[in-house]
């Protein structure tokens, strides 16, 4: 058990038979009445975000999430196969479980799989990934004075806005949190 006064961003708790990750919190001490903690929580199973208020000093159960280093091997129909780097055990995750992460996954890529009591909760990607441009309009020589962007389709099917000087076949560094172009690789 952990007191809500000890909340911090990223903490995982179990409330009402659901697993929640603390996204944001604020200790509030009104002039009249008891202090409380206002929090913004994300459900780890469904991905939904909810605001919840706790009385100051209230206790909640801390959930121990295990992060296992794994390697993305391949897609097999609707499922995707990952291998544990230590035990070589393979697990399959459905497209519905990793829908957002699919746009960034490449074969043999290292990821972290979040588990709670042997239940897979999701895939944690690295902060940035290197992806190759598969389709984009050719850049126009000399048009570099302004901050002009164009859409580029990457090898995984993700479409990002890139500077006009980027051409097909180039490797780019993409921020996985925002899904945006960072720089050339």
Swiss-Prot record:
Any GO CC annotation of this UniProt entry: cytoplasm
PROSITE patterns: EFP
Database matches in Gene3D superfamilies: 2.30.30.30, Nucleic acid-binding proteins (2.40.50.140)
PANTHER family: ELONGATION FACTOR P (PTHR30053), ELONGATION FACTOR P (EF-P) FAMILY PROTEIN (PTHR30053:SF12)
Family as reported in the entry's similarity comment: Belongs to the elongation factor P family.
Known function: Involved in peptide bond synthesis. Stimulates efficient translation and peptide-bond synthesis on native or reconstituted 70S ribosomes in vitro. Probably functions indirectly by altering the affinity of the ribosome for aminoacyl-tRNA, thus increasing their reactivity as acceptors for peptidyl transferase.
Full protein name: Elongation factor P
Organism: Bacillus mycoides (strain KBAB4) (Bacillus weihenstephanensis)
